[in-house]
Amino acid sequence: MIDYSGTVALVTGAASGIGKALAQALHARGARVMLADVNEAGVKSTAATIPGAHAIACDLANPSAPGALVEQAFGWQGRLDLICSNAGVGGSRKLIEQPIDDAANRLFAVNVFAALRIVQAYLPMLERTGARGRLMMTGSENSLSVPSAVKGSAIGLYGATKHALLVMAEWLRHELRSAPIDLHVLMPGAVYTPLVARALPDPSKAPPQLGLIMPERCAEIALRGMDLGLFYIPTHAHLADDMRPRSEGVAQALDALGLRPKG
């Protein structure tokens, strides 16, 4: 189990939902937490629930914001042991109708490129100070597949960003295998965040197949996954089943093309 006593953690997307729960869980384990979110009132509200927390309002879609945030977080206490790169935005347009506009570009800017810019700022800091760090990116069940629970919804571009985030994290894991940083990818299924609450005000009425969990449970799984040193941190058992159609489809195509040895 990781000893967070005296450590400093930065949590982005901390105004609500998973980010807020991660910040509270890390504080409960002994960490000092810096919170960041584009929602200034929300992130200050979260900070008010955590003794000693520091809140920053920033828009990670701004190319200079991720690096500046990492520097500010390090300067706060002179160390930065963990970053939970959790900030993300959603979308609700069918891909066939999705214009490549500012909203589409913002999806990739926040969900993918901000996470990369955070790593690019964090690693040199660790190398400069001789410290070892830890970084967890928040992906999604949509990082792995088109989950059964969301088929028919209009979140295709969001799903594409979460696929991209996972592949990027896997490449970083390979590139940084000798670097002083431990990487993790949290892949939540259905979590009762404010975004979900707008469509489903009463969580007790969620369809059982959705497997809806509270943000606090998601944070508990996330910290347990880091304790265990896991790179992939899924929150729902169905994620493995959701991946099966893709792998089976590729296997069937190889058979049809005669590209797999028989027997």
Language model segments and positions:
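Conserved mid-core segment of classical short-chain dehydrogenase/reductases
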Residues: 67, 90-105, 148-151
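Canonical Rossmann dinucleotide-binding motif of NAD(H)/NADP(H)-dependent dehydrogenases/reductases
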Residues: 2-34
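Active-site loop of short-chain dehydrogenase/reductase
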Residues: 7, 79-80, 126-141, 178-181
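Catalytic loop of short-chain dehydrogenase/reductase
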Residues: 136-164, 169-170, 174-177, 190
